């Protein structure tokens, strides 16, 4: 499936890679993994693409692999207005979270919040 990689390499157009679900949701997948993904994400073409998308859309979400796995999230954090860390309850270790914060801060990314997922919902313990 074609996506961001093909768009940045000028093999496909925006219309060819964009999946228009409704008037409020458009998704562009990563596409085929290039030989140098971090370089491609750090490129001027990626910066220009994000700038164009900011003119077209109100919100842009860049879903990346975990910070501990590859540098993609760290690279893209410098191009984003903010970073949301996603942490799984009962699974993600505190040291991994602290290391992730450090990695984002090293490149001057802006952490705007944390999403805690995988939390068990207990109906009887619900309160404000």
Protein language model annotation of sequence segments:
Residues 1-128:
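P-loop NTP-binding module
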């Amino acid at each position: 499936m074609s996506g961001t990689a093909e768009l940045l390499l000028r093999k496909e157009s925006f219309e060819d890679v964009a999946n228009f679900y409704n008037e409020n949701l458009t998704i562009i997948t990563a596409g085929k993994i290039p030989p140098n993904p971090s370089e491609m994400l750090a490129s001027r073409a990626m910066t220009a693409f994000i700038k164009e998308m900011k003119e077209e859309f109100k919100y842009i979400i860049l879903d990346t692999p975990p910070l501990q796995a590859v540098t993609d999230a760290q690279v893209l954090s410098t191009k984003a207005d903010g970073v949301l860390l996603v942490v799984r309850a009962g699974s993600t270790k505190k040291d991994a979270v602290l290391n992730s914060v450090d990695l984002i801060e090293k490149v001057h990314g802006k952490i705007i919040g944390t999403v805690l997922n995988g939390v068990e919902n207990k109906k009887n313990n619900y309160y404000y």
